[in-house]
Swiss-Prot record:
Cellular component GO terms held in the UniProt record: chloroplast; peroxisome
Protein known as: Acetolactate synthase small subunit 1, chloroplastic
Gene this chain is encoded by: AHASS1
Pathway annotation from the record: Amino-acid biosynthesis; L-isoleucine biosynthesis; L-isoleucine from 2-oxobutanoate: step 1/4; Amino-acid biosynthesis; L-valine biosynthesis; L-valine from pyruvate: step 1/4
Gene3D superfamilies (alphabetical): 3.30.70.260, ACT-like. Chain A, domain 2 (3.30.70.1150)
Length: 491
């Protein structure tokens, strides 16, 4: 450095100022001028033939190498950025009006775009399954913010654990007579089901992981897809073989040799009066136990016939199913749910997923309201910039489906009985361990409730459920009007 300080060359003075700056950007920009300086000094040494120029040339080369090594070591010593990947977050909350808006607001204020969201309610509690893209460190900060919300009981990121993940999709596709055979072949290949048949259209129900959904959509594109409605992803942890049974208290039918059956309390109160989940009743908090008792005085959430107008009931309240097409941008869910929250609507069901058009998402929600109030709500939703379409499917014939994953505590002796019950409801076993079995079921609410009632004696450990998804029937057949009527007699 002494040689540099006594030199009067302008290029060397520039080098001294660059060496005194610790900024990597300045070092790299100064290094660009070194070849010019070296060639300049080489020309001086060859012209004069003295050794002073050669020494200066060697000195500049050594300084250039040191600066290059320093900049490389500084870049390599920097902490590597964590990778951005998809995260599955489970949020267990107490059911309260405006809760969805508050949770969506936490993600919106941090610029996260929720890729899918499924909300399944169970009387006074709800389980949110949210899929977002982000880094580990920032997602951990979001989880800490969610835990500060009132009535949020448990928040957990289950992305890195072995899990059973499922999704439900309804696809309405053009089906002309010449292409119907190929479509039915694809339905059998992907183990899908046809839920509605019209003259020139088919509505197909598909369940599986997100990769299967993409494959089905890609193969049906050539037939022109009319509409797609998807639930968010739901997930349950896979139980390890040989592990100790954490759910033995749940199952009286599977473990009848137990001397004492301790009553299972889903929630307990702390000293401060806050409600916290019992540690022994959950495998990790990603799902919630189902209550073994049912109060007939409480309205069943998502009941298709809840609040129907009768001679004794003149309020006109009923469950309305709304379908919205919105832009797929960060914060749009917070804006839409804010309209419901400001008007005091308690959302009973919510399913958010990608629509048939790129950049568009479809929101399917169920709210209790009168026909008059819903018409005003639809007008308010149309005023939002990011909302393209709003349809009230309540008074139209529509296909509705829900997806449920349910984990039952069974041993080897009771496993056969549970599988027999599952076969009646066309449920599938998706995971089996020494002490549990996990079933997958699709259908309407009545089907879900009926299966839960039959499985309660065996011990229901955990339940993950999507909200309701619906598409209007192209056939125009409404099965509601066929209920309660006997088949016509033929002579």
């Amino acid at each position: 450095m002494a040689a540099i300080s006594v030199s009067s060359s302008p290029s060397i003075r520039c080098l001294r100022s660059a060496c005194s700056d610790s900024s990597p950007a300045l070092v790299s920009s100064t290094r660009v001028s070194f070849p010019a300086k070296i060639s300049y000094l080489s020309g001086i040494s060859s012209h004069r033939g003295d050794e002073m120029g050669k020494r200066m040339e060697g000195f500049v080369r050594s300084v250039d190498g040191k600066i290059s090594d320093a900049s490389f070591s500084e870049a390599s010593s920097a902490t590597p950025k964590s990778k951005v990947r998809k995260h599955t977050i489970s949020v267990f909350v107490g059911d309260e009006s405006g809760m969805i808006n508050r949770i969506a607001g936490v993600f919106a204020r941090r610029g996260y775009n929720i890729e899918s969201l499924a909300v399944g309610l169970n009387r006074d509690k709800a389980l949110f399954t949210i899929v977002v893209c982000g880094t580990e460190r920032v997602l951990q900060q979001v989880i800490e913010q969610l835990q500060k919300l009132v009535n949020v009981l448990k928040v957990e990121d289950i992305s890195s654990e072995p899990q059973v993940e499922r999704e439900l999709m309804l696809v309405k596709v053009n089906a002309h007579p010449e292409s119907r055979a190929e479509i039915m072949w694809l339905v059998d290949t992907f183990r899908a089901r046809v839920v509605d048949i019209a003259e020139h259209a088919l509505t197909i129900e598909v369940t599986g992981d997100p990769g299967k959904m993409i494959a089905v959509e890609r193969n049906l594109k050539k037939f022109q897809i009319r509409e797609i409605v998807r639930t968010g992803k739901i997930a349950l942890r896979r139980e390890k073989m040989g592990a100790t049974a954490p759910f033995w208290r749940f199952s009286a039918a599977s473990y009848p040799d137990l001397k004492e059956q301790a009553p299972v309390s889903v929630l307990r109160s702390s000293k401060k009066g806050a409600i916290v989940p019992q540690k022994e009743t959950s495998a990790g908090g990603d799902v919630y136990p189902v209550e073994p008792f049912f109060d007939p005085k409480v309205h069943r959430i998502l009941d298709a016939h809840w609040g129907l107008l009768t001679d004794e009931d003149t309020s006109g309240l009923r469950s309305h199913t709304l379908s919205l097409l919105v832009n797929d941008i960060p914060g749009v869910l917070n804006i839409v749910t804010g309209v419901f929250a400001r008007r005091g609507y308690n959302i009973q069901s919510l399913a958010v997923g990608h629509a048939e058009t790129k950049g568009i998402s479809r929101i399917t929600t169920v709210i209790p309201a009168t026909d008059e109030s819903v018409s005003k709500l639809v007008q308010q939703l149309y005023k939002l910039v990011d909302v393209h379409e709003v349809h009230d499917l309540t008074h139209l014939p529509f296909s509705e489906r829900e997806l449920m994953l349910i984990k039952i505590a069974v041993n080897a002796a009771a496993r056969r009985d549970v599988l027999d019950i599952a076969s009646i409801f066309r449920a599938k076993a998706v995971d089996v361990s020494d002490h549990t079995i996990t079933l997958q079921l699709t259908g309407d609410l009545d089907k879900m409730v009926a299966l839960q009632r039959l499985l309660e004696p065996y011990g229901i450990c955990e339940v993950a459920r999507t909200g309701r998804v619906a598409l209007a029937r192209e056939s125009g057949v409404d099965s509601k009007y066929l209920r309660g009527y006997s088949f016509p007699l033929t002579g």
